[in-house]
């Protein structure tokens, strides 16, 4: 379910309507994807902050809910380096949609090193041209090749990130 963004609608994850949706998704075994913005960095029209505290709260409130944080989680994954927080994030995953527009390419290997390749899901935001300097038209191959080459993915990592991980969390 998603890409959800309650904050753009003036809401929060703690609102009863959103919690009802989260419990529904959890009971159905569906993962929920959230739009995530990094706390500092890019500014663009329509940007609305996505408070990291809300994601941590949700992961603790419904620990069985599979949560996918888009755009490498807005760098939320680095909270997993905190030993008091990491156990609460077992069901939090990170997609890579639009990452070439947001981060330097070394972010992919760093992300793998921090959270493990098992928690990373390849996403594209297609038909967005995520590599506008080299793409005339949107495509999947450019980003996939960038990720594979920059992160120096093993065949096991590539298989998981490019499909296995999402399949493992779908009902």
Residue ranges and their predicted role:
Residues 1, 25, 71, 94, ...:
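Divalent metal-coordination and catalytic microenvironments
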Residues 1-20, 24-28, 142, 148, ...:
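Mid-domain alpha/beta scaffold segments of enzyme catalytic cores
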Residues 6-8, 37-41, 127-129:
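A short, flexible beta-alpha/helix-coil linker loop
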Residues 8, 74-76, 100, 127, ...:
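Residue-level detector of flexible, active-site-proximal loop/helix-junction positions
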Residues 9, 46, 99, 135, ...:
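Short, surface-exposed alpha-helical recognition segments that flank or form part
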Residues 14-122:
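Catalytic pocket-lining loop regions of alpha/beta-barrel enzymes
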Residues 114-121, 130-171:
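Mid-to-C-terminal alpha-helical segments outside catalytic/metal-binding sites
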């Amino acid at each position: 379910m998603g890409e959800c963004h309650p904050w753009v609608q003036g809401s929060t994850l703690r609102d009863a309507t959103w919690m009802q949706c989260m419990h529904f998704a959890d009971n159905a075994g569906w993962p929920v994807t959230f739009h995530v913005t990094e706390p500092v960095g890019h500014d663009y029209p329509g940007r609305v902050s996505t408070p990291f505290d809300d994601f941590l709260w949700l992961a603790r409130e419904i620990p069985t809910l599979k949560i996918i944080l888009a755009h490498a989680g807005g760098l939320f994954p680095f909270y997993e380096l905190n030993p008091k927080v990491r156990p609460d994030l077992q069901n939090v995953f990170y997609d890579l949609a639009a990452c070439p527009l947001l981060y330097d390419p070394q972010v992919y290997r760093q992300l793998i090193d921090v959270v493990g390749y098992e928690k990373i899901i390849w996403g594209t935001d297609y038909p967005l041209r995520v590599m506008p300097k080299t793409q005339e038209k949107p495509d999947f191959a450019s980003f996939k090749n960038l990720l594979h080459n920059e992160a120096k993915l093993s065949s096991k990592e590539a298989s998981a990130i490019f499909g296995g991980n999402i399949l493992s969390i779908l009902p």
